[in-house]
């Protein structure tokens, strides 16, 4: 049994990503919206889930940018992200058994900043793994106005591009890529490998652009999720765990690549 049509397999082969429109049924899409709101309402909790913030470009207020490391504290989300269907889909694309590497939700509220041109691989491969697949779950509708994902089309090579000093894709190279907006609806899934260049613009609308970004790796390359979050908590902790006056900028190319988090 395959989870993908031949057309979707071709899209994956040619571009390194595939867009599954309306994949989740209405009930599950609503559950994901409800769960995302629950995580938004959770208080900051040092040593548990990790909340990161940004500053609104519109009002200057503190906005929740993302939450990470939450599946151990939410049964519903864990059941979905680590269930037979999702593992089966990702494993099919990988050609072997997949395992969860890390999980996050980007909230991108009105006034939220964009994410610079980047590939995920340079940050992910630091844990001794060569290949990852990220699944974006569209919580809200996303379009150009609220900062949808923009993907480089026709990039099927598994190679790391030349980078700027901050780890983002070299601007001269980025200018040559075929960038296209990828608009989504609630319940859409987008799966992409860790070498596909992507970015997004700021949210200039009055609506949120919430999305889950769930990353998996090959089981044969090890289960590194706990190692990842342990290292991130030490080197680039959430605001609630930071030591006043300590400089965390040295870890930004690994843990804040192309991101608006300060």
Swiss-Prot record:
Catalyzed reactions: (2-aminoethyl)phosphonate + 2-oxoglutarate + O2 = (1R)-(2-amino-1-hydroxyethyl)phosphonate + succinate + CO2
Activity regulation (UniProt): Activity is enhanced by ascorbate.
UniProt KW Metal-binding keyword: yes
Keywords: Dioxygenase, Iron, Metal-binding, Oxidoreductase
Domain of life, source organism: Bacteria
E.C. number(s) listed in UniProt: 1.14.11.46
GO molecular function, one term: iron ion binding
Residues holding 2-oxoglutarate: 108
Cofactor(s) required, per the database record: Fe(2+)
Segments crossing the lipid bilayer: none
Binding site for Fe cation: 118, 120, 198
Cofactor note text: Binds 1 Fe(2+) ion.
Family annotation (SUPFAM superfamilies): Clavaminate synthase-like
Keyword presence, Ion transport: no
UniProt family annotation: Belongs to the PhyH family.
Function: Involved in the degradation of the organophosphonate 2-aminoethylphosphonic acid (2-AEP). Catalyzes the hydroxylation of 2-aminoethylphosphonic acid to yield (2-amino-1-hydroxyethyl)phosphonic acid.
Protein's UniProt name: 2-aminoethylphosphonate dioxygenase
Species assigned in the record: Uncultured bacterium HF130_AEPn_1
UniProt gene name: phnY
